[in-house]
Regions:
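N-terminal low-complexity, Pro/Thr/Ser-rich intrinsically disordered segments
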Residues: 1-13
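Amphipathic alpha-helical packing elements
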Residues: 17-58
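Compact alpha-helical subdomains of small soluble proteins
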Residues: 41-83
Length: 83
């Protein structure tokens, strides 16, 4: 699995590992899940960040139907820590 945070796609994340991350790291981790499915970001900074990744292939404006149950649960958990 490509990216800086492959664990967000492979397994359920834990509270303790998310507590150790900064807001920016949490944001990148959450959006990396979408990027792996080729999501085309509307925010310039996210598009710029992921466009620098050799594995990123933007091709979808909606990837919700591509997300696994693990990814969906991790996105919701990460959002709780981004507040």
């Amino acid at each position: 699995v490509p990216g800086r945070y492959p664990q967000a796609t492979i397994r359920l994340l834990t509270v303790s590992e998310l507590q150790a991350l900064s807001m920016q790291e949490l944001r990148i981790m959450r959006n990396e899940i979408y990027a792996r499915h080729g999501y085309i970001f509307k925010k310039k900074e996210l598009m710029s960040h992921f466009s620098d990744q050799p594995w990123y292939k933007p091709c979808n404006t909606n990837v919700d139907h591509l997300l696994t149950d693990i990814e969906k649960k991790n996105i919701e958990l990460i959002k709780q820590f981004e507040r």
